[in-house]
C-alpha cells in the first residue's frame, strides 16, 4: 500500500481526505482502543458539558437536527456531528447550525496527525476525532453525536453520553451488526451509560435493548411505555412523566423522529421553554429527507436506502395528492436489501430511471431492473435525472432515492448547472 506524503494544516481539504481514505488498511475497523488513545492525547473525550449520542438504523439525522433546532431556539450553543455527507465533507460538522470553513477541518486533521503517532485510524475515526476537536475549540454548551455504524464499537462511543438515543431498529449492515433485530439492538444499545437516560423510539423494541439497559443500569425510556405521542391532521400531542404538551406544530421531519428528539430533550434535564420546543420543531429540516425541492413537476429527494426507510417514504408519497405519474431516479449500493427496498417503492412509482453507482459497492442499473421487471437503464445518475426531467409533465412527480450517493449526484448536477448559468 502506498501512503501519500502527509498533508499540512494549510493543505487543501481534498488532499487531506484523499490521504485519510488510504491511511488505514480497512475502510471499517470497529473497536475503540485506537481511537480512544488518540482522543485522550488530544483531550477531547469530553467535548462539551452535555452530550447526546444518537444511534439507530434510520432517523438519526432528523432526530439530531430536531434536537439541535430546539436547543438553539432555547439559547444553547450547539455542535452536531453527522454522517455521511451529501455534497460537501464540511456538512459533517455543524456549530450553531452552520458548517465550518475547510481551513478549520484541515487544522484539526493536522492536530490529529501530530497526536496519533504510529496509531492507524480509519477515515471515520479521523473524522470523529476532528469533530470532537472542533467542538472543544468552539466552547459549546451541548454536543450531539450521530453514530456512524452500530453503536457499541462505533468511534463516537468513546464519549460518554449524558443521554443516549436509539431511534429505530431494522435490518441493515447485517455483515457488521448481526443477522437479526435482536443482534442489531444489542449493538446499538452499546451507547447506553449507567444511571443516564436511554431513549428508545423504536415501537417494537427488541428485548436485547432492555437487556443491555439492565446490564448497564441505564434509565430506559421506551416509546409507548414511559413516553408517547399522538397525531392529528393539524397538530400533535406528546406525553411523558413530566406532563403533556399539546397542539405542537407538525414537523417537517418524520414525526417519530421529532417525538424521539423531544423525549430525549425532556429526559436531559436541560432547561428549555415550551416556546423554544415549538419554534425548534417547526424549523427543523434536513436535506435529502423527503425534501420537496420544486413544483411543476414536483421534485422530491429522499435518501431512503433500506426497506424500513422505503416503507416510510412510500407512506409519505401516498399521502400526497396525486395528479400525474411518479418517475423515480434510483441508484443503490449492492450490499443493501435492494429487493426489499424496491418492493415498497413499486406501489407508488410508475416509471423507473435506473442508474449505476460508482465504486465497488455500487449496484448496476441492470441489477436494479432485475427486481423491477420494467424501467430504463442509464450510464449515470446524471443521465437518468436528465431523462426523467425531460419526460416529466407539470403534474408529475420526480422522486430521487435509493442512496445518499444518488441524491448527492443530482444535487451536484443542479448546483453545477446553476453556477454555470445552465
Residue spans for each PLM region:
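Active-site-proximal loop/hinge segments that shape catalytic or ion-binding/gating pockets
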Residues: 403
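Charged, amphipathic alpha-helical linker segments immediately N-terminal to NTP-binding catalytic cores
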Residues: 1-27
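C-terminal helical cap/extension that packs against the catalytic core
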Residues: 199, 203-220, 230-235, 266, ...
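ATP-dependent carboxylate-amine ligase catalytic core
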Residues: 12, 26-28, 32-49, 73-159, ...
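Beta-strand->loop->alpha-helix junctions that form or flank phosphate-binding loops
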Residues: 81-84, 200-202, 214-231, 248-252, ...
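Acidic, Mg2+-coordinating active-site environments of NTP-dependent enzymes
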Residues: 119, 141, 146, 161-244, ...
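Nucleotide phosphate-binding/pyrophosphate-handling subdomain across enzymes
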Residues: 48-50, 137, 142-147, 154-165, ...
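A conserved segment at the C-terminal end of the G1
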Residues: 50-54, 62-79
Amino acid at each position: 500500500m502506498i501512503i501519500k506524503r502527509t498533508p499540512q494544516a494549510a493543505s487543501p481539504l481534498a488532499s487531506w481526505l484523499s490521504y485519510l481514505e488510504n491511511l488505514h488498511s480497512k475502510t471499517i475497523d470497529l473497536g475503540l482502543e485506537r481511537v480512544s488513545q488518540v482522543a485522550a492525547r488530544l483531550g477531547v473525550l469530553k467535548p462539551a458539558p452535555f452530550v447526546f449520542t444518537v444511534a439507530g438504523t434510520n432517523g438519526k439525522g432528523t432526530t439530531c437536527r430536531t434536537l439541535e433546532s430546539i436547543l438553539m431556539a432555547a439559547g444553547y450553543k450547539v455542535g452536531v456531528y453527522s454522517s455521511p455527507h451529501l455534497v460537501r465533507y464540511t456538512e459533517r460538522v455543524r456549530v450553531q447550525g452552520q458548517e465550518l470553513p475547510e481551513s478549520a477541518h484541515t487544522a484539526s486533521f493536522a492536530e490529529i496527525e501530530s497526536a496519533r503517532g504510529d496509531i492507524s485510524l480509519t477515515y471515520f475515526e479521523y473524522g470523529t476525532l476532528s469533530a470532537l476537536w472542533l467542538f472543544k475549540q468552539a466552547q459549546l454548551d451541548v454536543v450531539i453525536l450521530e453514530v456512524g455504524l452500530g453503536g457499541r464499537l462505533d468511534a463516537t462511543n468513546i464519549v460518554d453520553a449524558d443521554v443516549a438515543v436509539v431511534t429505530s431498529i431494522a435490518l441493515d449492515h447485517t455483515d457488521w451488526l448481526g443477522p437479526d433485530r435482536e443482534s442489531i439492538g444489542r449493538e446499538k444499545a452499546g451507547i447506553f451509560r449507567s444511571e443516564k437516560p436511554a431513549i428508545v423510539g423504536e415501537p417494537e423494541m427488541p428485548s436485547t435493548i432492555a437487556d443491555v439497559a439492565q446490564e448497564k443500569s441505564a434509565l430506559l425510556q421506551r416509546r409507548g411505555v414511559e413516553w408517547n405521542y399522538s397525531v392529528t391532521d393539524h397538530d400533535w400531542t406528546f406525553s411523558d412523566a413530566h406532563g403533556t404538551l399539546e397542539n405542537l406544530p407538525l414537523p417537517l421531519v418524520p414525526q417519530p423522529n421529532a417525538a424521539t428528539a423531544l423525549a430525549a430533550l425532556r429526559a436531559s434535564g436541560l432547561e428549555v421553554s415550551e416556546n423554544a420546543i415549538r419554534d425548534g420543531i417547526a424549523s427543523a429540516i434536513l436535506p435529502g429527507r423527503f425534501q420537496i425541492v420544486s413544483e411543476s413537476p414536483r421534485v422530491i429527494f429522499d435518501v431512503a436506502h433500506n426497506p424500513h426507510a422505503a416503507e416510510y417514504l412510500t407512506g409519505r408519497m401516498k399521502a400526497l395528492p396525486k395528479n400525474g405519474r411518479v418517475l423515480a431516479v434510483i441508484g443503490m449500493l449492492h450490499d443493501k436489501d435492494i429487493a426489499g427496498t424496491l418492493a415498497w417503492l413499486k406501489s407508488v412509482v410508475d416509471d423507473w430511471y435506473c442508474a449505476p453507482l460508482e465504486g465497488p459497492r455500487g449496484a448496476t442499473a441492470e441489477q436494479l431492473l432485475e427486481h423491477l421487471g420494467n424501467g430504463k437503464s442509464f450510464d449515470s445518475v446524471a443521465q437518468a435525472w436528465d431523462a426523467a426531467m425531460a419526460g416529466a409533465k407539470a403534474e408529475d412527480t420526480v422522486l430521487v432515492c435509493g442512496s445518499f450517493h444518488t441524491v448527492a449526484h443530482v444535487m451536484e448536477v443542479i448546483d453545477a448547472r446553476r453556477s454555470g448559468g445552465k
